[in-house]
Swiss-Prot record:
Pfam families (alphabetical): GATA
Protein name: GATA zinc finger domain-containing protein 2
InterPro entries: Znf_GATA (IPR000679), Znf_NHR/GATA (IPR013088)
GATA-type ZnF: 88-115
Protein's UniProt keywords contain Chaperone: no
Signal peptide boundaries: none
Region called Disordered, residue ranges: 21-85
Biased composition (Polar residues): 57-74
Length: 131
């Protein structure tokens, strides 16, 4: 059974539909398509191959950040790095959905989301003691 190109999923749609339309355009005067055109119209391996260069999922950057390096944020040359830190200061994690900043011994450090929330909770409790 041949599927209609209009009902194909988004990840199979454009390449196979384009190949099918070029195969019908390349028919001869008597209405018969050559065997190579028919074979190229039914070949969908390039559209489903996960390592294909046209696959948007395979070519997505894992971090999603396209930075060429440190820039200044307008405060007289202070460097602003738009990439996340390499490690959490507390637990050593390298991946986190959100990076937070905390202070230890007067020094600003990078924390993963979980450690950052814990740091905020402890800071609130310690400041309530001194009130």
């Amino acid at each position: 059974m041949v599927k209609n190109s209009e009902h194909l999923p988004w990840y199979l749609g454009s390449d196979s539909a384009t190949a099918a339309s070029t195969a019908t355009d390349a028919t001869s005067a008597d209405g018969a398509a050559s065997e190579t055109d028919a074979a190229s119209a039914t070949d969908t391996t390039s559209a489903t191959d996960p390592t294909s260069a046209t696959d948007p999922i395979a070519t997505t950057n894992t971090t999603g950040i396209t930075s060429s390096g440190p820039t200044t944020n307008g405060r007289r040359g202070r460097p602003y790095i738009s990439t996340p830190p390499n490690r959490c200061y507390d637990c050593g994690r390298t991946r986190s959905p959100y990076w937070r900043k905390g202070t230890y011994n007067g020094q600003v450090v990078h924390l993963c989301n979980a450690c950052g929330l814990n740091h905020i909770k402890i800071a609130k409790k310690s400041s309530a003691i001194f009130l």
